[in-house]
Design a protein with these regions (language model features):
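Active-site loop-to-helix "anion-binding N-cap" substructures in soluble metabolic enzymes
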Residues: 1-244
Length: 244
């Protein structure tokens, strides 16, 4: 919950000027709902995609304060973050409720950025793979293979976000490899190999290159570093360097 519409617009202007017309790295910005209209106009003629931070599973109805997939589509939103760790922690979202949102998103031709990840307590208890496995399997129930081109998965080790603790490149890769294995079991090896799996555990300019060099880490779900255009663009540069 950061940035007013004016602040969001200024940030996107800076990102547009710094990223130029490069197309090698796909860039998506996900401002608060209140900033979507102004940011939509800013990215319309650029290579930057527009995403939202959440949505409701129902297309319409008496759900005060919620936003539907079609409302997002009307603002030219292409991506939507679903199941973020903060939504799970503070708003009680479950694997089942997140699954409903994921299906609603693809039915509206939105790209769900489907978030998974374990807490510190779960990691220290050795339950990481069990927790992440359940989140993937239950969160993607009835997901059609025909819509796999829309699916993006984001691994957020909750224990590494704003805690001072960090996941090593190897620790992150280990979970990403397991996630891809589970996706392979659900959708087949060939399909799983093409699904993007992002890392969302406090990626920043200092650690981006090492993380993005891992074979199963396909990008980043950037948190605090995205509030600075320089930090955000430095991460984009790190991504470009791994393609060289």
């Amino acid at each position: 919950m950061n940035l007013t519409p004016d602040e969001s617009a200024a940030l996107v202007d800076e990102i547009n000027s710094l990223t130029g017309s490069q197309t090698s790295v796909q860039v998506c910005v996900c401002p608060p709902f209140t900033s979507l209209p102004v940011v939509s106009s800013k990215v319309e003629q650029s290579e930057v995609h527009l995403g939202a931070q959440n949505m409701h599973a129902e297309p319409s109805g008496a759900f005060t304060g919620e936003v539907s997939a079609e409302m997002l589509r009307s603002l030219y939103v292409s991506h939507v973050i679903l199941g973020h760790s903060e939504r799970r922690q503070y708003f009680g979202e479950t694997n089942a409720s997140i699954n409903s949102k994921v299906i609603a998103a693809i039915n509206a031709n939105l790209r769900p950025v489907f978030c998974i990840g374990e807490t510190l307590e779960e990691r220290e208890a050795g339950k990481t793979m069990d927790v992440v496995g359940a989140q993937v399997r239950e969160g993607l129930v009835n997901y059609p293979s025909s819509a796999l081109d829309l699916l993006v998965v984001a691994y957020e080790p909750v224990w590494a976000i704003g805690t001072g603790k960090t996941a090593t490149n190897e620790m992150a890769q280990e979970v990403h490899r397991e996630v891809r294995k589970i996706l392979s079991e659900i959708f087949g090896e060939s399909a799983a190999s093409s699904i993007r799996i992002l890392y969302g555990g406090s990626m920043k300019p200092e650690n981006a290159a090492g993380l993005l060099a891992q074979p199963d880490i396909d990008g980043g779900l950037i948190g605090g570093a995205s509030l600075s255009s320089k930090s955000f663009c430095d991460i984009i540069e790190a991504a470009l360097s791994t393609q060289a």
